[in-house]
């Protein structure tokens, strides 16, 4: 059986927050604002995986109204979902993700992100692709107000 899922997430940039994208801390004057650590890439990936198994969305499992998830490490949330997915007999076919940000530039961190995501999903890094783009200064990401991410995942059983 093959299952496909897609995920999308966006978070606002804010001062006095640490910037974590793809499980990697990125030095920058702003970080992403959210109930958890606001890792926009891991949230999109988690949502894509949840979609692939037909189990709703990330908010169903980790609601932002639950204080148990306040400042939660998104890598731990992804690992929790992945444990359920593996228990159901699925494994990663491949994952393709895009980070959309004007600043900071993500390209220097993409390889580290790829390795961290592969580790979290018990996969080979060749099964994971992460890329970054801008919106040519258009929209909220172009105005440097936030960062968005898209992810598509293929699961095999």
From Swiss-Prot:
What functional role does this protein have? Involved in the biosynthesis of isopentenyl diphosphate (IPP) and dimethylallyl diphosphate (DMAPP), two major building blocks of isoprenoid compounds. Catalyzes the conversion of 4-diphosphocytidyl-2-C-methyl-D-erythritol 2-phosphate (CDP-ME2P) to 2-C-methyl-D-erythritol 2,4-cyclodiphosphate (ME-CPP) with a corresponding release of cytidine 5-monophosphate (CMP).
Bilayer-crossing residues are none
Q: In which pathway does it act?
A: Isoprenoid biosynthesis; isopentenyl diphosphate biosynthesis via DXP pathway; isopentenyl diphosphate from 1-deoxy-D-xylulose 5-phosphate: step 4/6
**Similarity comment text for this entry:** Belongs to the IspF family.
What is the protein's given name? Answer: 2-C-methyl-D-erythritol 2,4-cyclodiphosphate synthase
**EC number of this enzyme:** 4.6.1.12
| Positions of 4-CDP-2-C-methyl-D-erythritol 2-phosphate binding | 9-11, 35-36, 57-59, 62-66, 101-107, 133-136, 140, 143
Site for Transition state stabilizer, residues: 35, 134
Which PROSITE patterns does the entry link to? Answer: ISPF
> What GO molecular function annotations does the UniProt record carry, in alphabetical order?
2-C-methyl-D-erythritol 2,4-cyclodiphosphate synthase activity; metal ion binding
Provide the gene name from the record.
Answer: ispF
Work out whether the entry's keyword set contains Metal-binding: yes
Give the record's subunit note: Homotrimer.
